[in-house]
Amino acid sequence: MAEQDQNTQQAGGDAPSFNLQRVYLKDLSLEMPNAPHVFLEQEQPQVEVSINVGGQRLAETVFESTVTATVTTRINDKVLYLVEGTQAGIFELANIPAEQMDALLGIVCPTMLYPYLRANVADAITRTSLPALHLAEVNFQALYEQRLAELAQQQGGNNNGSDSGIILPPGTTRQ
């Protein structure tokens, strides 16, 4: 019986493992360069939103994944407010096949972090006493696929099948 338990533990030691260890707000800034004059404006503001994904290896099986949102709201040429926030998470990824690693870091991790970022950005904007702005849902798989297509186009498409097209975060290497 003890031998069976030991065999089960050994087999489980090689099983793929994906765990979220911690979620934290890495950076949040809000600027209102034209306050208080912007409170007198009656026009509808123009909103620009930019979303970026990043990551880095912290240890052999530990990665930091980040999602950054930059929201710039303008009325004519005046900046109403500028909010930039970075939500981060520490993930443990063990025994994950190399061909799946980039997709986990580029799609799954950001998808888990984004709701926290949305809430933090919305809270910051609400504190300006201006009308609330809630960021729309983001399809991180589509962003990931777009990034892969852009990289393939930059490389001129002369892949020759020798590379899988996997993009790893800075500081990581393929196993």
UniProtKB/Swiss-Prot annotation:
Disordered: annotated segments: 154-175
Gene3D superfamilies named in the record: SecB-like (3.10.420.10)
UniProt keyword terms in alphabetical order: Chaperone, Cytoplasm, Protein transport, Translocation, Transport
Coiled-coil features, chain-numbered ranges: none
Gene Ontology CC, one term: cytoplasm
Localization, UniProt: Cytoplasm
Keyword Plastid included in the entry's annotation: no
Key word Zinc present: no
Major location category of this protein: cytoplasm
Entry GO MF terms: unfolded protein binding
GO biological process, one term: protein folding
Cited InterPro entries: SecB (IPR003708), SecB-like_sf (IPR035958)
Functional summary from the UniProt entry: One of the proteins required for the normal export of preproteins out of the cell cytoplasm. It is a molecular chaperone that binds to a subset of precursor proteins, maintaining them in a translocation-competent state. It also specifically binds to its receptor SecA.
Subunit: Homotetramer, a dimer of dimers. One homotetramer interacts with 1 SecA dimer.
The family this protein is said to belong to: Belongs to the SecB family.
Protein name: Protein-export protein SecB
